[in-house]
Amino acid sequence: MRTRQITAMGQGPLVACALVICALGATTAAKAADYPVLRGSQIEDAPPPPPDFGTGSTNWTGFYFGGLAGYSDTNFDVGRGAANIVANHLRSTTIEAEMQASSLLNMPNFSKRNATFGGFAGYNLQFGDVVLGFEADYTHHDAKGTSADAIARSRTLSDGYSTSVWLTGTTAAELKDVGTLRVRAGYAMGAFMPFITGGLAIGNGTVTSTATVRTNGVDADPSEAPVLQSYSSASGLLVSSRKNSTMLGGTVGAGVEALFGGLLLRAEAQYVRMEAQGNVVVETTTARVGAGIKF
């Protein structure tokens, strides 16, 4: 009997130890479930931030240059292209003074479309979101064409003659190159910037005008003279003028640029209006794209 009690008393501490060990094991397993390294990570990677199109993320200040290519529509207003040479030929005559013969010819306008290319360079200064700067560009055009007209008029003039004048005229015009010097204003939108431009334009080209002038006059009252009085230049007189013309005018435009590091990309539209020698007006509208480097 005593032996059983001793045995039972000896087993009690062992059972208690076993219970404590089991409790500690369960607690450790429960805590281990909260450690990602032990149960596998359930935390997803954070999504990348959205692109920053806000202000201040791109520095637009600095010098830049690049090349451009586009397509141009050039209009030549040559209506009075031959007026100067006709006026010079008929200067100090009753025909010019009273009939304004030099204003009679009116050649139709013509347009040419062609690919263009060139380059640009400029400098920007950024003030917060506003970007101001200046830019010079060059565009090679090589647009040309010809227009012609003919007209005849008769009138009794103050000198007593019934006078007739026949005119034919031709004007050929060519636009070779255009350069501009412009100011720019843009609004920075991160890596993108819409902008407007305006400034001066100078063009290089040629204007060639020719005219044939023929006149004839008959005394309006021949009964007062014993012999019929008349004059004529029946064969006509050809006069011409060819000038290497420097064209001067203005330009406006608008576009958008994108800046990625030092790479500059742009798309823009530009309008140029210039006056050439010989009463010729040249207008060109160009859509173009460009790429360059910004420092």
Please identify what each model-predicted range represents:
Residues 2-6, 10-295:
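Gram-negative outer-membrane beta-barrel domains
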